[in-house]
Design a protein with these regions (language model features):
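Double-stranded RNA-binding/processing signature
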Residues: 1-152
Length: 152
């Protein structure tokens, strides 16, 4: 028998693994970016796989186009006018965080903007604002109009 998951996936995982509640405002921007990187990657992989079964190398190639720092940097540029004050603040905190690493094949500017984008994704995920996260990703991918095919 399957049980229906009433909450967001993060709340469900915390409940199932008996994790204590945490105030996400206490998370560092890089922690938000860490979880944001994972959930954004999962969403993009789901979109790519949903477009049809193909070779793993092709799936990786298509996914990589959208998860690399340059693509995320371009996405956040498109999204800034759509962000609330709170979302913009989270993005800026992520962008301005001092990261000990840098992405391969990315400028420092793109890498920092991508970190801000990922921090925003992580923040929305941890707040169970999955619909808002998907809405922003659809805008960034050029699919904000109902039923419009993606252009990547």
């Amino acid at each position: 028998r399957r049980s229906k998951m009433e909450k967001g996936i993060d709340a469900y995982i915390k409940e199932q693994f008996h994790l204590p509640p945490v105030d996400i405002r206490t998370y560092s921007p890089l922690t938000l970016a860490y979880i944001g990187d994972g959930i954004y990657d999962l969403i993009i992989r789901s979109i790519i796989v949903g477009k049809g079964n193909t070779k793993a190398s092709r799936l990786h190639q298509e996914t990589s186009k959208l998860v690399r720092a340059q693509a995320q940097s371009e996405m956040i540029d498109l999204l800034l006018p759509y962000l609330s004050e709170e979302e913009t603040d989270i993005y800026r905190r992520g962008r301005n965080a001092k990261s000990p690493t840098m992405a391969k094949n990315a400028t420092m500017t793109d890498y920092r903007k991508a970190t801000g984008f990922e921090a925003l994704m992580g923040y929305l995920y941890l707040k169970d604002e999955f619909e808002r996260m998907v809405e922003l990703i659809k805008i960034a991918l050029g699919e904000e109009e109902e039923g419009k095919e993606q252009t990547f």
